[in-house]
Amino acid sequence: MRQYEVMYVLRPDLEEEKVKSNVARYSDVVTNYGGEISKLQEMGKRRLAYEINKFREGYYVLMNFKANSDAVAEAERLMKINDDVIRFMFVRDEK
């Protein structure tokens, strides 16, 4: 298993309940594939550097985890098809 970090930005107009369900969904994907979450940080609503899909703000979430590539591929697939996620990036930690 390798160490990964993902930062994703959710739409700012989501209700708190919907934000929590999205965070739980991606956390569950990692754990269901046998991964371990070392850090989950909800950074809250922040201003974007530039407009994305006509939004000037977004709800930022940072997750550090250890998992195999199947978990990353599944989480990435789910983020691509979810309209609530306006931007995401996975980074493999080389440590």
Curated annotation (Swiss-Prot):
<dbReference type="InterPro" id="IPR020814">
    <property type="entry name" value="Ribosomal_S6_plastid/chlpt"/>
</dbReference>
<protein>
    <recommendedName>
        <fullName>Small ribosomal subunit protein bS6</fullName>
    </recommendedName>
</protein>
<keyword id="KW-0689">Ribosomal protein</keyword>
<comment type="function">
    <text>Binds together with bS18 to 16S ribosomal RNA.</text>
</comment>
<dbReference type="InterPro" id="IPR000529">
    <property type="entry name" value="Ribosomal_bS6"/>
</dbReference>
<dbReference type="InterPro" id="IPR035980">
    <property type="entry name" value="Ribosomal_bS6_sf"/>
</dbReference>
<dbReference type="InterPro" id="IPR020815">
    <property type="entry name" value="Ribosomal_bS6_CS"/>
</dbReference>
<dbReference type="GO" id="GO:0070181">
    <property type="term" value="F:small ribosomal subunit rRNA binding"/>
</dbReference>
<dbReference type="InterPro" id="IPR014717">
    <property type="entry name" value="Transl_elong_EF1B/ribsomal_bS6"/>
</dbReference>
<dbReference type="GO" id="GO:1990904">
    <property type="term" value="C:ribonucleoprotein complex"/>
</dbReference>
<dbReference type="GO" id="GO:0005737">
    <property type="term" value="C:cytoplasm"/>
</dbReference>
<keyword id="KW-0694">RNA-binding</keyword>
<keyword id="KW-0699">rRNA-binding</keyword>
<keyword id="KW-0687">Ribonucleoprotein</keyword>
<dbReference type="GO" id="GO:0003735">
    <property type="term" value="F:structural constituent of ribosome"/>
</dbReference>
<dbReference type="GO" id="GO:0006412">
    <property type="term" value="P:translation"/>
</dbReference>
<dbReference type="Pfam" id="PF01250">
    <property type="entry name" value="Ribosomal_S6"/>
</dbReference>
<dbReference type="GO" id="GO:0005840">
    <property type="term" value="C:ribosome"/>
</dbReference>
<comment type="similarity">
    <text>Belongs to the bacterial ribosomal protein bS6 family.</text>
</comment>
